[in-house]
Amino acid sequence: MIFPAIDLLNGQSVRLYQGDYEKETTINPDPLKQAKQIESAGLKHLHLVDLDGAKEGKPVNLNVIQSLREQTNLFIELGGGIRTLEQVNQYLNIGINRVIIGSAALTHPELVRTAVAKYGSDKIVVGVDGRDEKVATQGWLENSDTSFDDIVEAMLSVGVSNFVVTDIARDGTLSGPNIELLSRLQNKFPKSNIIASGGIANIKNVTDLQASGIHDIIVGRALYDGDVTLAQLKEVDG
């Protein structure tokens, strides 16, 4: 599955460079219009991030998120500041298809355990974001000593199967995805579904990932810079 990405900041679609809130570029002041273009191209999935929420630890762009849910038929996965069961409940209740728990998976693993038990593994995704294969937290503002392997192994043990893995050094850089890391994790943990995030520069990066065994791929900056088109993504969307 191909997931075009929309990152929300102050109600607008933006992109950040390596997760730096000071390095922001506006993609579209109207995220709903952008989502409808994705849907019109025949793509069926959307990766949505509330960047304000990631920093604040609570829903910030809820009105925009609700309008995207109500006015498109896209399968929406949503992340950004989801740190309580109440927030998980709130988003799933408005029709978000699955939610991504990031920082909280490291700091409050019991939240993930409870959420998976209550809603099922198809509704709960764990975000594994970091630098040098060490997990970063709090909207990528803090670094930890926990390795990618450790968090995936721990979360598999509580029933998680889907993991969005982001190498922050690649995010928003068009430098190519870290295929070695992603395929290594997928091979080491065959019961997991590793979702690639960060670094896609062209359509070959997408097909190379697919050939390596990674089938769920998030595409952000390359799409909005024009290096990858919606039509190209539709062609390779399995």
Curated annotation (Swiss-Prot):
What EC number(s) are associated with this protein in UniProt?
Answer: 5.3.1.16
Which one of the record's GO molecular function terms can you name?
Answer: 1-(5-phosphoribosyl)-5-[(5-phosphoribosylamino)methylideneamino]imidazole-4-carboxamide isomerase activity
List, alphabetically, the InterPro entries matched: Aldolase_TIM, His_biosynth, HisA_bact_arch, Isoase_HisA-like, Isoase_HisA-like_bact, RibuloseP-bd_barrel
The broad enzyme category this protein falls into is isomerase
Q: Which residues form the signal peptide?
A: none
Q: Which reaction does it catalyse?
A: 1-(5-phospho-beta-D-ribosyl)-5-[(5-phospho-beta-D-ribosylamino)methylideneamino]imidazole-4-carboxamide = 5-[(5-phospho-1-deoxy-D-ribulos-1-ylimino)methylamino]-1-(5-phospho-beta-D-ribosyl)imidazole-4-carboxamide
Going by the UniProt record, its keywords in alphabetical order are: Amino-acid biosynthesis, Cytoplasm, Histidine biosynthesis, Isomerase
Q: Does the keyword Cytoplasm apply?
A: yes
**Biological or metabolic pathway of the protein:** Amino-acid biosynthesis; L-histidine biosynthesis; L-histidine from 5-phospho-alpha-D-ribose 1-diphosphate: step 4/9
**Record-linked Gene3D superfamilies:** Aldolase class I
The Gene Ontology biological process terms listed for this entry are: L-histidine biosynthetic process; L-tryptophan biosynthetic process
GO cellular-component terms in the record?
cytoplasm
Q: What is its main location?
A: cytoplasm
Q: Does the keyword Cytoplasm apply?
A: yes
Q: Where in the cell is it found?
A: Cytoplasm
TM segment ranges = none
**What would be one Pfam family of this protein?**
His_biosynth
What's this protein's family per the entry? Belongs to the HisA/HisF family.
Q: What is this protein called?
A: 1-(5-phosphoribosyl)-5-[(5-phosphoribosylamino)methylideneamino] imidazole-4-carboxamide isomerase
